[in-house]
Design a protein with these regions (language model features):
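Catalytic loop of the DD-peptidase/beta-lactamase superfamily, centered on the K-T-G motif
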Residues: 1-91, 98-101, 108-154
Length: 154
């Protein structure tokens, strides 16, 4: 029984973000090395700058008025500590993937089943389109549990 339990525990993992590229191509490249200012959104992400650092992405964001720096690894969870003084949301793990048009980020709160997914892409008018999809939320439901917001380049 113990052997079966260990095998089961070793097989458990959160789903990785969609996308097959680790480096930006075509339209997705427009998201990098530029400050993006977002419209109002459920996660209170005010701005973000994505920077490639090897096979990981550095994310410098202003979230609810606070400057945060975190990292995402390609289809692998990278642990971050965004709220060191709040044990209830202390550690987040972030993974990313891309396709030719979009950047996909998955964020999981360690030691919980909470996960949220972000998709970002640039439309033909040079506007950033973003979606946020949590697996659970306190917010009123949206169709398909997906919230949409936009951003502009500074």
């Amino acid at each position: 029984a113990e052997k079966a339990l260990r095998a089961k525990l070793n097989s458990l993992s959160l789903v990785q973000p969609e996308g097959t590229f680790r480096t930006a191509r075509k339209e997705a490249a427009k998201l990098f090395d530029r400050k993006i200012l977002f419209t109002e959104n459920p996660r209170k992400v005010e701005s973000v700058v994505f920077t490639k650092e090897g096979y990981r992405i550095k994310i410098e964001a202003v979230i609810n008025g606070e400057q945060k720096t975190l990292y995402a690894s390609y289809k692998a969870w990278k642990r971050n500590n965004l709220y060191p003084d709040d044990f209830t949301k202390k550690y987040q793990s972030v993974a990313y993937a891309m396709d030719a048009e979009a950047l996909y980020l998955s964020v999981g709160l360690i030691n919980t089943s909470y996960k949220e997914e972000y998709s970002l892409w640039v439309n033909s008018e040079d506007k950033v389109i973003a979606t946020w999809r949590p697996n659970v939320t306190y917010l009123p439901e949206e169709p398909d549990m997906v919230w949409k917001f936009t951003g502009t380049f500074e």
